[in-house]
């Protein structure tokens, strides 16, 4: 996280304001919404919770002094949620075949990766889609296939 090797895109999107936890968020958001489009583009503090990485880090050298989405933290939280789903819900399921929890992990991780990829700087594209999205969809399809194949009693 502090090294800045895994970083998100600049936090310009309207969706990104949902995650703010600063106390004066509503004042900031109201003021920001009153700006014209050109003023919004030049606004110095686009999101109050963005992370400015040191210029010596890869993220800081690519986006100097610019607040970025902390994509690695988003992924951490989503992976913890996925772990709790697997540990407290799926592992207690009866009549599961071998590999059952593994395939569910692949599905949950792929969904997490699809979500987090919207906040990351991705250079690798497959046609007009980001490569992690394509790979994740393929992994979800393969996992569902094996879950249905190996767990006929479950479905």
Model-derived regions: residue spans:
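A feature for loop-to-transmembrane-helix boundaries and adjacent hydrophobic helices
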Residues: 1-155
């Amino acid at each position: 996280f502090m090294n800045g090797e895994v970083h998100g895109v600049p936090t310009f999107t309207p969706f990104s304001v949902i995650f703010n936890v600063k106390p004066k968020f509503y004042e900031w958001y109201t003021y920001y919404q009153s700006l014209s489009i050109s003023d919004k583009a030049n606004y110095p503090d686009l999101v109050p919770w963005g992370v400015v990485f040191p210029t010596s880090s890869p993220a800081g050298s690519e986006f100097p002094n610019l607040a970025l989405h902390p994509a690695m933290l988003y992924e951490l939280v989503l992976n913890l949620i996925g772990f709790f789903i697997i540990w407290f819900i799926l592992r207690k399921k009866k009549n599961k075949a071998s590999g059952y929890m593994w395939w569910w992990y692949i599905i949950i991780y792929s969904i997490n990766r699809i979500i987090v990829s919207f906040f990351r700087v991705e250079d690798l594209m497959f046609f007009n889609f980001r490569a992690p999205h394509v790979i994740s969809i393929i992994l979800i399809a393969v996992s569902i296939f094996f879950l249905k194949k190996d767990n006929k009693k479950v479905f």
